[in-house]
Amino acid sequence: GLGDILGLLGL
């Protein structure tokens, strides 16, 4: 999802 990668980056 949208927060999949962003979540890993901590964004």
UniProtKB/Swiss-Prot annotation:
Distribution of this protein across tissues and organs: Expressed by the skin dorsal glands.
GO CC terms of this entry: extracellular region
GO term, biological process aspect, one: defense response
Compartments reported by the entry: Secreted
Keyword Cytoplasm in annotation: no
Modified residues (Leucine amide): 11
Record bears the keyword Secreted: yes
Keywords noted in UniProt: Amidation, Amphibian defense peptide, Secreted
Annotated function: Shows neither neuropeptide activity nor antibiotic activity.
Protein's name according to its UniProt entry: Rubellidin-4.1
Organism whose genome encodes this protein: Litoria rubella
Biological classification of the source: Eukaryota, Metazoa, Chordata, Craniata, Vertebrata
